[in-house]
Amino acid sequence: MIAMARSRLARYPQVGYVVSDFRSFEFNRGFDAVLSSLALLHLATDEEKKLFYQRIYDGLAPGGIFYNADVVLGSSEFLQEIYMERWRNFMSRNVSKDEVEGKWIPKYQAEDRPARLMDQLEWMTEIGFVDVDVIWKCYNFAVYGGVRR
């Protein structure tokens, strides 16, 4: 992923790259942007996620942005069931239904701890992010973020 980012952003010499385990990374500089993709859902609890959002906020320069692309839970059990069914249908177009149910769903249940999207937007606002919004969403996948005041 870093190689692809470097290639696509090569014309921007001011862009820096950091490769690190996000759980132990120290956000000790005034970052202009923090971007995450399919990572934060691995934090085990909502409290860990809230604390991590605070760390990101603290590490951003004023006006810095944070955007996260991740798996999210629906705002109700009804919606969550629809999202999971749509996800199963999507995966079944590329792999067998047996593989979906025998490999991918158990992997999701064992490794992923997504949180409700609405809760995450609320946490970000409580922490101090402004212009918090969802810029893309398709069932249980979303891209959302905000700006440090």
Where are these regions (language model features)?
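Conserved SAM-binding loop
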Residues: 5-6
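Conserved SAM-binding strand-loop segment of SAM-dependent methyltransferases
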Residues: 10-23
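A short acidic, Gly/Pro-enriched loop at the edge of an enzyme's catalytic core
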Residues: 23-34
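Hydrophobic beta-strand segment of the Class I
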Residues: 34-35, 124
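A conserved beta-strand element that flanks and buttresses the S-adenosyl-L-methionine
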Residues: 35-36, 67
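A short glycine-rich, Lys/Arg-flanked "PGG" loop and its adjoining helix->strand segment in the class I
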Residues: 50-62
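C-terminal alpha-helical "lid/dimerization" subdomain adjacent to the S-adenosyl-L-methionine
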Residues: 69-127
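Core SAM-dependent methyltransferase catalytic element
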Residues: 121, 125-149
